[in-house]
C-alpha cells in the first residue's frame, strides 16, 4: 500500500467526544512514519482536537452537515471531495448515519478499503432517529468491513443478522491504562483544587446529551446527599444540555454540592479525585469512560442498557433504569463501601493485557492499516 498509508477518519466533529477521544488515543500511539491519519468532518467550527491533529501531521477536511433535504448536495460534495483526493488507502467512517452515502462514493473514487465503524447502540429521538435508521438499513452492503465497539452497537447499526453471523469485527474502545493507574498524589492535588478533601465524591464523565441521562444523575445524587451531607457530584464534560442541568441542580437545592468541571484534557487525573463512578446512560456503544474508570480502580455503577462487554473487571455493577433514584443511591454507597474494604490492586494489570489497552490494540491496527488483512483485528 505504499510507504506511508493515509487513513481518512470520517466524523461529525473533532470535539471532545467518545469516538473522537478513542481515535486520538490511537493516533498518538500509532507509528506515524508508516501510517498517517486525516479527518473529514461535518462542521467548519474549530474542534477541541484540531490543533493536536495538525501537530501530529494530520489534515482536516470539511463536508456540509447532512440535513435530509440536502441529500443530493451532500452526495455531490462527497463526490467532489474524493475526486480531488486520491491519497487515501482507507476510509474509516465513524459517522454511520451517512456512511451509506460517503463510503460507496469513496469506493467508486478508487479508495481500496472502506470501513463502517459502529460507535453507538442508539439513535436520537423522533424524525432524526428514524432517518438515521433508514440510512443505515443496508450499510453492511456498502462497505468492505464492519467494525463495532460492542455487540449492542453492532446490532443497532448493522442489524442482528450481521452480528450473529460473525460478519462484524469487535474492536473495543481502548484506553492507555497506565495513564489511569491509581495515583494518591494526583488524588490529593485534584481534590484540594476543587475543595473535595473530606468529601465522598461521585464522578461522571460525559457530554451533556440526552443519551447520558444527566437529569437522573442529579436525582440520584439528591438522594445520596440526603444520606451523606459530605457527598459531592463531580461532572466532567460539556454539551447542549449543560445549562439545563445547572438549572435543575438549583431547583433540587443541590447546586452547592455539584461541580460542573467542563471539558478537561487530559481527563485521566480527574478520575483520581473520585470515590465511585456513576453512568446511568439511556444508550451507549461501548463507553470508554467506564473502561477508564476501571483502569483508575473505581467502582462503577452503570445502567443495564449498556453492553456487558464493558465489564472488564469486577469493579462494574449493573442496575436497571427502571429502579428509582433512591435504590441507585443505596447501591452507590454499597459499592463504594465494599471498594474501601477490598482494593483490587490488579485492575490496571488486567486491562493492560487485553485489547482494551491502546498499547495492545495499536499493534493490531498497524498490521491492518499496512496490509488490509482484517483477520489481524480478530486476534
Question: Where do the model's predicted regions map?
Answer:
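A short helix/loop element that forms part of the nucleotide-sugar donor recognition site in Leloir-type
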Residues: 78, 181-195, 339
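Aromatic "clamp/platform" in nucleotide-sugar-dependent glycosyltransferases that forms part
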Residues: 263, 282
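Short His-centered aromatic/hydrophobic patch
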Residues: 93-101, 118
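N-terminal strand-loop element at the rim of the active site
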Residues: 3-5, 9-73, 167, 240-242, ...
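Nucleotide-activated donor-binding/catalytic signature segment of Leloir-type glycosyltransferases, i.e.
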Residues: 246-262
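A short, active-site helix/loop in glycosyltransferases that binds the activated sugar's phosphate group
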Residues: 143-181
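A conserved mid-protein helix/loop that constitutes part of the nucleotide-sugar donor-binding site
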Residues: 20-25, 200, 204-223, 240-246
Amino acid at each position: 500500500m505504499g510507504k506511508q498509508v493515509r487513513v481518512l477518519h470520517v466524523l461529525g466533529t473533532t470535539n471532545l467526544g467518545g469516538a473522537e477521544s478513542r481515535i486520538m488515543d490511537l493516533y498518538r500511539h500509532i507509528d506515524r512514519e508508516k501510517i498517517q491519519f486525516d479527518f473529514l468532518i461535518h462542521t467548519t467550527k474549530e474542534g477541541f482536537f484540531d490543533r493536536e491533529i495538525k501537530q501530529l501531521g494530520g489534515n482536516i477536511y470539511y463536508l456540509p452537515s447532512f440535513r435530509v433535504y440536502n441529500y443530493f448536495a451532500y452526495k455531490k460534495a462527497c463526490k467532489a471531495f474524493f475526486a480531488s483526493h486520491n491519497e487515501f488507502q482507507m476510509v474509516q467512517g465513524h459517522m454511520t448515519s451517512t456512511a451509506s452515502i460517503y463510503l460507496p462514493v469513496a469506493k467508486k473514487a478508487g479508495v481500496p478499503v472502506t470501513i463502517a465503524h459502529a460507535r453507538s447502540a442508539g439513535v436520537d429521538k423522533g424524525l432524526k432517529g428514524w432517518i438515521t435508521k433508514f440510512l443505515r438499513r443496508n450499510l453492511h452492503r456498502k462497505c468492505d468491513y464492519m467494525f463495532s465497539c460492542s455487540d449492542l452497537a453492532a446490532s443497532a447499526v448493522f442489524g442482528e443478522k450481521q452480528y450473529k453471523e460473525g460478519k462484524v469485527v469487535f474492536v473495543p474502545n481502548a484506553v492507555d491504562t497506565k495513564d489511569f493507574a491509581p495515583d494518591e498524589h494526583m488524588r490529593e492535588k485534584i481534590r484540594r483544587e476543587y475543595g473535595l478533601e473530606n468529601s465522598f465524591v461521585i464522578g461522571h464523565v460525559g457530554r451533556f446529551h440526552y443519551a447520558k441521562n444527566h437529569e437522573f444523575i442529579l436525582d440520584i445524587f439528591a438522594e445520596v446527599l440526603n444520606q451523606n451531607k459530605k457527598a459531592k457530584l463531580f461532572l466532567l464534560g460539556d454539551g447542549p444540555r449543560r445549562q439545563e442541568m445547572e438549572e435543575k441542580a438549583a431547583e433540587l437545592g443541590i447546586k452547592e454540592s455539584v461541580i460542573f468541571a467542563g471539558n478537561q484534557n487530559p481527563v485521566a487525573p480527574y478520575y483520581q479525585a473520585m470515590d465511585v463512578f456513576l453512568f446511568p446512560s439511556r444508550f451507549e456503544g461501548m463507553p470508554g469512560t467506564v473502561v477508564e474508570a476501571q483502569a483508575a480502580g473505581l467502582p462503577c455503577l452503570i445502567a443495564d442498557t449498556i453492553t456487558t462487554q464493558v465489564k472488564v473487571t469486577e469493579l462494574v455493577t449493573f442496575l436497571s433504569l427502571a429502579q428509582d433514584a433512591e435504590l441507585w443511591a443505596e447501591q452507590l454507597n454499597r459499592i463504594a463501601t465494599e471498594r474501601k474494604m477490598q482494593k483490587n490492586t490488579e485492575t490496571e494489570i488486567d486491562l493492560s493485557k487485553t485489547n482494551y489497552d491502546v498499547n495492545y490494540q495499536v499493534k493490531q491496527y498497524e498490521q491492518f492499516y499496512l496490509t488490509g488483512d482484517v483477520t489481524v483485528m480478530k486476534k
